[in-house]
Amino acid sequence: MVKLSFTLRFGDVWVAENEEIVAKGHSLDELDRNLELELRKAGYKGRVEIFMKFDYSTIPEWMRQFHPHYFNRTVVFDLD
């Protein structure tokens, strides 16, 4: 299994990015679908685990009472 790390941030849309790939979506479901497409375009195959660490600086001030790890995500794709 390949494991990749991404930064996750939210502005007008959700954005997951690393040095190689950028994916965007208006919802987390759309982000996941677009990330899967970008992984396929980049040539990834098999099982790929994505860890998304949330960029806490993009969270609104009023939400900073929450711990940043609440917004971290892990997604696994099985790419053929």
Swiss-Prot record:
Swiss-Prot/TrEMBL keywords: Signal
Signal peptide residue numbers: 1-15
InterPro entries: DUF5395 (IPR035157)
Domain of life, source organism: Archaea
Pfam (any one): DUF5395
Protein name: Uncharacterized protein AF_1616
Lineage, opening ranks: Archaea, Methanobacteriati, Methanobacteriota, Archaeoglobi, Archaeoglobales
